[in-house]
From Swiss-Prot:
It holds the Pfam family Ribosomal_L14. InterPro entries: Ribosomal_uL14, Ribosomal_uL14_bac-type, Ribosomal_uL14_CS, Ribosomal_uL14_sf. One of its GO terms (molecular function) is structural constituent of ribosome. Signal peptide: none annotated. This is Large ribosomal subunit protein uL14c. CDD domains: Ribosomal_uL14 (cd00337). One of its GO terms (cellular component) is cytosolic large ribosomal subunit. Belongs to the universal ribosomal protein uL14 family. Keywords: Chloroplast, Plastid, Ribonucleoprotein, Ribosomal protein, RNA-binding, rRNA-binding. The lineage of its organism: Eukaryota, Viridiplantae, Chlorophyta, core chlorophytes, Chlorophyceae. Part of the 50S ribosomal subunit. GO terms for biological process: translation. SUPFAM superfamilies: Ribosomal protein L14.
Length: 122
């Protein structure tokens, strides 16, 4: 569960290292976001000489949360960190690699490009 002012790691090679959530998209009174949801975030830490700079406002899709999710078959899955992948307006990732495992729910939400780049899908 990611709320405004929550910090997330970046799970791609776009140049950003850490994001801070500003807003969860999908409704005027939406308070939190979970795996597969799109957020608006600000880059708090970034690598030098990369396309994404510090203090840039970006869109990102959440790929891992510590709270986790419960699947319809009764299985619960949670991760060790909160992480997101930076995307563009069309929903494609800005980086060319994705690090760490991601949840299968991203495939259901039509983020197939991120799923294909991921080394492990849980």
């Amino acid at each position: 569960m990611i709320k405004p002012l929550s910090y997330l790691n970046v799970a791609d090679n776009s140049g950003a290292r850490e994001l801070m959530c500003i807003r969860a998209l999908g409704g005027s009174y939406r308070e939190s976001a979970n795996i597969g949801d799109v957020i608006i975030a600000v880059v708090k830490d970034a690598l030098p000489n990369m396309p994404v700079k510090r203090s840039d406002i970006v869109r990102a899709v959440i790929v891992r949360t510590r709270k986790g999710i419960r699947r319809e078959n009764g299985m619960a899955i949670r991760f060790d960190d909160n992480a997101a992948v930076i995307i563009n307006k069309e929903g494609n990732p800005r980086g060319t690699r994705v690090f760490g495992p991601i949840a299968r729910e991203l495939r259901d939400k039509n983020f197939t490009k991120i799923v294909s780049l991921a080394p492990e899908v849980l």
